[in-house]
């Protein structure tokens, strides 16, 4: 198990050492609720919520995942989606589109694996679509002002300690 950044176009996961005085450390696979952790590695991730978490067929917004790295890996390997979803929280239901890209110092990539590539990307691009709900009817407002609107945003986050990695030679 390694710390670093792991991502695709539709999800991003950061894993880092995060020791906690309040955490209760338990053997891997134990069913202890609350602050129980199996290791000091903490994973934080972002993705669009999926239809299995809601009653709609559409993605439900920006979701944040936080949990013990070993326990999340074990749940994923065992196909235990319930344990994986337990750490998923909806943070921005108005987000309707989310795309990540990773800059290796030479070109943009659609995926990143710090373990396989030997480091962090030099930058991460985040494309967000945010949809505002339709407005409630009010006399004097035109019909077009009551419709849902979607705005797109682009944010590039530089990781200044990262070194360029020529991934075309890997």
What are these regions (language model features)?
Residues 85-170:
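Short linear sequence signals and composition-biased patches located at protein termini or domain-edge surfaces
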């Amino acid at each position: 198990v390694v710390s670093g950044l792991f991502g695709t176009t539709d999800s991003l996961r950061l894993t880092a050492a995060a020791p906690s005085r309040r955490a209760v450390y338990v053997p891997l696979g134990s069913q202890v609720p609350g602050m129980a952790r199996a290791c000091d590695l903490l994973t934080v991730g972002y993705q669009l919520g999926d239809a299995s978490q809601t009653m709609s067929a559409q993605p439900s917004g920006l979701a944040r995942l936080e949990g013990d790295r070993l326990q999340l890996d074990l749940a994923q390997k065992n196909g235990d989606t319930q344990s994986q979803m337990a750490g998923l929280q909806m943070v921005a239901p108005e987000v309707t589109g989310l795309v990540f890209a990773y800059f290796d110092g030479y070109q943009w990539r659609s995926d990143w694996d710090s373990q396989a590539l030997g480091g962090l990307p030099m930058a991460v691009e985040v494309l967000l679509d945010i949809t505002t709900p339709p407005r409630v009817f009010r006399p004097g407002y035109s019909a077009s002002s009551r419709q849902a609107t979607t705005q797109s945003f682009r944010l590039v986050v530089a990781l200044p300690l990262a070194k360029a990695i020529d991934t075309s030679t890997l």
